[in-house]
Amino acid sequence: LVEQTVARYGRIDVLVNNAGISMRAMFKDLELDVMRALMDTNYWGTVYCTKYALPWLLESKGSVVGVISTAGFVGLPARTGYSASKFAIRGFLNTLRIEHINDGLHVLVFAPGFTASNIRSAALTFDGTPQGDSPREEGKMMSAEKVAGILARAIDRRTRQKVLTFVAKLYLWLDVRFPKVSDRLAYKYMAREPDSPLK
């Protein structure tokens, strides 16, 4: 991927790590191969792409972006593998930013919240089979195009971290100040999903 990009364009200015798999299952029921698949795609995919693009990004003083989720800040029940992978991406990129603080590398951790996309229909169940239809109302979510526009502006401004939705910002604020309240609200919020594994 990196070689093809450089061969065609001669440089890399921005790497957006956006590939991801989600899940819906309680950890007690989850087959560990599902967790491994999530980490391989979400976390290791980010690590490998960043590793091989990094020399070019350092040369261009470019941007590395990790698209995470509210689940990368606050543990979401029935999303243990997904949350773990997004926490790992955030930790990796925050550390990378500090390592290259004097090199001109821009690192952005981007948390869009629920976005209208097919990630939920492809989400894995406890045994790794896709769940099928999304349990959420996609029409009420931010469009992928709107999210992409906000992301492009954050890259232009060389923003360090961007969290989009009010609900996500509220959870982050509560998690720091009132963590027990945050835990309870996260549980209730996820339990309201149709066919939630928490019921």
Predicted features, each with a name:
Residues 1-10:
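Conserved amphipathic alpha-helix within the SDR
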Residues 10, 74, 95-106:
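Active-site-adjacent segment of SDR/Rossmann-fold oxidoreductases
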Residues 102-166:
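SDR active-site lid
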Residues 69:
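Residue(s) in the substrate-gating loop at a strand-loop-helix junction
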Residues 26-27, 31-36:
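Substrate-binding pocket helix/loop in short-chain dehydrogenase/reductase
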